[in-house]
Amino acid sequence: NPELSLDLVYNPGGAFLPPPQASLEQDYREMLGREFGITFSSLLAITNLPVNRFAHSLRRDGQLEDYQQLLVDNFNAGTVSALMCRHLINIDWEGRVYDCDFNQMLELPLGGGKNRHLWDLNPQGLEGKDIATERHCFGCTAGAGSSCSGELA
């Protein structure tokens, strides 16, 4: 059905940054179309952040510090204005609020303070708020950046 959209998500299969989203999309369009007759709307390239299972895997393989340094070394200031944590919040099933879904996984509350619930927030009070950050945040700013909608820069 041409009215439906199909978006593919590319996550690197290891401790490296994704290639440029546009070239990946072109390569996948050509190969999937030629080999399987598959067409899709867009491809989103997302960086693996070193949290939970991926961090455990990196630690187990002795790659955690090297991968973290790769993210730091590839910091791109051009991604900062488009970071999701600057424009959105994440809410868990109990109403607790976080700066992003990765901070939720790490149990880092909104702004790095005490746990807050959605019903206790004033939306206007969120403008210019502090954002809880740790080393995993470099994953969203490395290279072309990363978000739920793919590259940022």
Regions found by a protein language model. Give the residues of each.
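Radical SAM enzyme [4Fe-4S]-AdoMet core and its adjacent flexible, acidic
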Residues: 1-84
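A generic secondary-structure signal marking the coil-to-beta-strand transition
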Residues: 4-6, 87, 136-138
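Short, solvent-exposed loop/turn segments at secondary-structure junctions
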Residues: 11-15, 49-51, 90, 96, ...
